[in-house]
């Protein structure tokens, strides 16, 4: 053991010395660049956008169809694809982008929500003396600073705690984290620091206390990934790019080069998924930025091409916010099987993940129960035994497919690259693959540089460093106060709008419906527990939302926060969208069914029915069954064998509890398995059994019944002498 520590110490010091030398050697170079990414003056940008608002989808389709030839056509509407479109259009190139599904519908909306340089990559760079890993971390840290600056409403620094349970880990990880700060240089968000055991438990009281020796806190960035992706797409559209979601590339167009006699890619045959209409989009250069689907587009160009994408599934789960501090995350650097697990606060909930396992490429990745349970077990290992971590506490879960790649130029074709690869085919198709969210901008710059050089396009240098994304330019931390004062919004709703839409929050507020209450004046919520309002559905359509799934998962983030709340909001969302888009009753029903399937399969939603009926037996002891029957019969006064909303209202009125009818309907619907408007005794017992075993985290009806029982039991008869003699 002592020998291992000495070896580790030697490697650490040697690697640290190397990284220090490399960092110092690069310092002068970055000083000469005269661009500080952390403090860019984006207000002095080269020009204002062409459009104050993004053109409608219909207008974009007309531009795609009627333009004789674009300079660049980008296939793929994820972060990298939209980044390429923004980079190209701001250089003065005539740019188009098509996406088969919605913007950020794939990997870009299913991330860990971190903007990070990669602490674990730096660890590998030091221990393996890997210069490539070091450069990748350095680039990511500079891009992190830029992203935090250009979209301040969607991103923010986040302190992350690294709890330590062995004394030798303290100096080991402290040096490593300090190297992380050093590599960031002037773009370091805040300096890392050490916490004692007591201070660590103050910040994170649920931590496993036994053998805890202390903790190290470092800083990375966090963002709303789908909204960030959308902001990039909308910014590109405002600068003049013809961007369209739900446009599938059916085939690539080719023409013969008169000079070489070779076939060259010259555009794509595109199909509007919503209408079935097809037309050609011609371009001098076509960029393949399709993430996990990289090889499918490459095979359109050349069916014999060797695949380069090595897809890997990363599963995340969302748990209630009380599982983590409001403004501090946690990193487990070495799980039971050697992976890294993050435990992060996000949108007042807690994200835990991720896994890393080989997978097949699919449009509809499903989080497996094994991966969900793996994450739950790792969470249990790090939290105090006082905290019961239950499967029923998983409010949402998703799987994202990482597009890891092998470099086709590398002699070792089996080596997986965590960096990005820009490949050019014989026909001129440019493919950008790999990389990560944080470095989308530099990946896009490299790709467009390659396109300009290869196709001799007339373009200036990249201008996306410091270029504010939609909503970021006039945002300030106090913007929400004006929303409260000027429009009469709830403070929570106003804060949500400000950090979601930035300076465009005023446009959303103008669409907000009057509540009919004294306060708030405007802003009718979609569901009571979350600050999303009806006006966001109307505004989401202006942001190219075409389906109910777009709205619950990427315009709002309800599906990623609580699938049950998303399901509750669906009928209202479909009705609002139907009114704006003139949907027929049949289309509304189709949207409702499609969105429900999406929640059920892709967002880890075991429906309430399935949760309650996993076992045909009710696993309760006889005394418990008797107690729950007593509660049930207290509501079922007429001994009908079921309870209705009228029964619940009657009991609540008797104990002076006021609750509106809509909320009561929601509460009963949670338990009404056969959806007949009645909660029967066996349904209630199944619910209580599921709560008891932890398959569901709780029930509003169960809590309501318990409260009523306790209040009624506390009542005592009024003595005769206090009741005027009983007259």
Curated annotation (Swiss-Prot):
One GO location term (cellular component): mitochondrial inner membrane
List residues, modification Phosphotyrosine. Answer: 601
EC top class, as a word: oxidoreductase
The keyword Secreted appears for this protein: no
Regulation affecting activity: Calcium-binding enhance the activity of the enzyme.
Which CDD domains does this UniProt record tie to the protein? EFh
- EC numbers on record: 1.1.5.3
Q: Where is the transit peptide?
A: 1-42
Q: Report the catalytic activity.
A: a quinone + sn-glycerol 3-phosphate = dihydroxyacetone phosphate + a quinol
| InterPro entries assigned to the protein according to its UniProt record, in alphabetical order | DAO_C, DAO_C_sf, EF-hand-dom_pair, EF_Hand_1_Ca_BS, EF_hand_dom, FAD-dep_OxRdtase, FAD/NAD-bd_sf, G3P_DH_FAD-dep
Keywords, sorted A to Z: Calcium, FAD, Flavoprotein, Metal-binding, Mitochondrion, Oxidoreductase, Phosphoprotein, Repeat, Transit peptide
EF-hand domain mapped to chain residues: 623-658, 659-694
Q: Which Pfam families match?
A: DAO, DAO_C, EF-hand_7
Q: Which domain of life is it from?
A: Eukaryota
Metal-binding as a keyword of this entry, yes or no, is: yes
Please report which protein family the annotation says this sequence is part of: Belongs to the FAD-dependent glycerol-3-phosphate dehydrogenase family.
Function, as annotated, reads: Calcium-responsive mitochondrial glycerol-3-phosphate dehydrogenase which seems to be a key component of the pancreatic beta-cell glucose-sensing device.
State what protein this is by name: Glycerol-3-phosphate dehydrogenase, mitochondrial
Could you tell me which species this protein originates from? Rattus norvegicus
Q: Which gene encodes it?
A: Gpd2
């Amino acid at each position: 053991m002592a020998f291992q520590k000495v070896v580790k110490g030697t490697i650490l010091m040697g690697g640290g010395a190397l990284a220090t030398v490399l960092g110092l050697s690069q310092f002068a170079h970055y000083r000469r660049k005269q661009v500080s990414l952390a403090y860019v003056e984006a207000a002095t940008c080269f020009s204002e956008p062409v459009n104050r608002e993004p053109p409608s989808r219909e207008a974009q389709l007309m531009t795609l169809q009627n333009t004789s030839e674009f300079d660049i056509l980008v296939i793929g509407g994820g972060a990298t694809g939209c980044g390429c479109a923004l980079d190209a259009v701001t250089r003065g190139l005539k740019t188009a982008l098509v996406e088969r599904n919605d913007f950020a519908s794939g990997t870009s909306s299913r991330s860990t929500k971190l903007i990070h340089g990669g602490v674990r990559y730096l660890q590998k760079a030091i221990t393996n003396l890997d210069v490539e890993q070091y450069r990748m971390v350095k680039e990511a840290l500079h891009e992190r600073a830029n992203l935090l600056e250009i979209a301040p409403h969607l991103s923010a620094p986040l302190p992350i705690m690294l709890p330590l349970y062995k004394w030798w880990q303290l100096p080991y990880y402290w040096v490593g984290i300090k190297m992380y700060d050093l590599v960031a240089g002037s773009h370091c968000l805040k300096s890392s620091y050490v916490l004692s055991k007591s201070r660590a438990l103050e910040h994170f009281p649920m931590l496993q206390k036994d053998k805890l020796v202390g903790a190290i806190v470092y800083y990375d960035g966090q963002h709303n990934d789908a909204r960030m992706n959308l902001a990039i797409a909308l910014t590109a559209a405002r600068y003049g790019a013809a961007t369209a979601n739900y446009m599938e590339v059916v085939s690539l167009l080719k023409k013969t080069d008169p000079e070489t006699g070779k076939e060259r890619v010259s555009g794509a045959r595109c199909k509007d998924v919503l209408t079935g209409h097809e037309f050609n989009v011609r371009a001098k250069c076509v960029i393949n930025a399709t993430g996990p689907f990289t090889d499918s587009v490459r095979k359109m160009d050349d069916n014999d091409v060797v695949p380069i994408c090595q897809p890997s599934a990363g599963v995340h789960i969302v748990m209630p916010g009380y599982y983590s501090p409001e403004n501090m995350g946690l990193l487990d650097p070495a799980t039971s099987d050697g992976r890294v697990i993050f435990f992060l606060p996000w949108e007042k909930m807690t994200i835990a993940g991720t896994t890393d396992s080989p997978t097949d490429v699919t449009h509809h990745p499903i989080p497996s129960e094994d991966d969900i349970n793996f994450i739950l077990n790792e969470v249990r290992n790090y939290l105090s035994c006082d905290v019961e971590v239950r499967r029923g506490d998983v409010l949402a879960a998703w799987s994202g497919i990482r597009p890891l790649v092998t470099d086709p130029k590398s002699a070792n074709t089996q080596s997986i690259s965590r960096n990005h690869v820009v490949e050019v085919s014989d026909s001129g198709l440019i493919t950008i693959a790999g990389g990560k969210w944080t470095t989308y901008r530099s990946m896009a710059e490299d790709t467009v540089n390659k396109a300009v050089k290869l196709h001799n396009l007339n373009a200036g240098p990249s201008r996306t460093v410091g270029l504010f994304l939609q909503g970021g330019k006039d945002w300030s931390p106090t913007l929400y106060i004006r929303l409260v004062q000027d429009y009469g919004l709830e403070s929570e709703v106003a804060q949500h709008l400000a950090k979601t839409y930035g300076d465009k929050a005023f446009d959303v507020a103008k669409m907000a419906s009057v509540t009919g209450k004294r306060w708030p004046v405007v802003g009718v919520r979609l569901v009571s527990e979350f600050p999303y309002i009806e006006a966001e559905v109307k505004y989401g359509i202006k942001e190219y939302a075409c389906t109910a799934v777009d709205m619950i998962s990427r315009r709002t983030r309800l599906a990623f926060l609580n699938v049950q709340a998303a399901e509750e909001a669906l009928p209202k969302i479909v009705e609002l969208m139907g009114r704006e888009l003139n949907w027929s009753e049949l289309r509304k029903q189709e949207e409702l069914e499609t969105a429900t399937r999406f929640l059920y399969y892709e967002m880890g939603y075991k429906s309430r029915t399935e949760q309650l009926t996993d076992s045909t037996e009710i696993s309760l002891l006889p005394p418990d069954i008797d107690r729950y029957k007593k509660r049930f019969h207290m509501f079922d006064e007429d001994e009908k064998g079921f309870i209705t909303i009228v029964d619940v209202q009657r009991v609540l009125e008797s104990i002076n509890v006021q609750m509106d009818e809509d909320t009561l309907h929601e509460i009963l619907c949670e338990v009404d398995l056969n959806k007949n408007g009645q909660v029967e005794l066996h349904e209630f017992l199944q619910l209580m059994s599921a709560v008891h075993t932890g398959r569901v985290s709780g029930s509003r009806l169960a809590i309501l019944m318990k409260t009523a029982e306790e209040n009624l039991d506390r009542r005592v008869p009024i003595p005769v002498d206090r009741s005027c003699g009983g007259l």
